[in-house]
Amino acid sequence: MRKILLIKRGAIGDLLMATPLIRQLKQKLNCQLDIVVGKAASCALINNPYLDRQIILNDADFTLKGAPRLARGLFALRGKYDYVLVLDKHWYFNLMAHLVGGKVIGYTRSNFAHRLLIAAVDYVDITRYHGLYYLDLLQVSGLAAADYHDIELDLCITISDKLAVEAFILERKLNNFTVVINSGGNNAYETKGLRMLPTAKILALLNGLLEQGKTVLLAGSKIDFQNNQAYLQQLNYPERLINLAGKFNLAASSYLIGRSEHFYTTDCGAMHLGVARQIGERMTA
């Protein structure tokens, strides 16, 4: 049996977009399939049925300052894998992947990077859907042909995730509700909130929804809690504007999004939760 290791530090949206690659690798090759991943985003792959093992490292290990720790972590895996697929784009990760041994496949943006790989995907069109770029790794590997139509995202939602959300809905006596997540650009590797809506615009959106009589659930991670509280303080709708940031885990949040009548978000991991739930026109991003 082939043994394949994936390396991807994060973030949540990127890992969700990588799930078609993970699924196809397992289904087409029946291989041992493991992934080295950053802790903060690893929640996107919890209970993924196609992965044998998540090797979770501290997010700081993937920075330049953390290079010695990443090197030790990868070297500990040396000789255990036949192929290493690097899902991060920078040549640095291709170089580090050689510590594992095996045949390294990844992305290139320079001639130097080509020398580090036995098979390479040229990363040239940043507007192309990343899920397709991830499938390119399988295609160029020669191990199997990638199916570019099989791009549904995998996110495992357990019964306990569903029950937690349904209990909240019952407790608050909610019928129809809208979910809003204003996030993006605040994670283990960036902190400036570059993909968030500016305060004036998010307040205008929320005020418009509330004036229509809608109940709005402000979801998100713990890092979004303070921003959401600020919105509550500026909008006087205590019964219909509810801050849920940090209340539910990723899978439960995805289920909540699927239960909503409409979902508003930004270019962040939450957008991919909506895609995973296949809510289509009920999402505005």
Segment roles from a protein language model:
Residues 1-285:
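Catalytic machinery of carbohydrate-active enzymes
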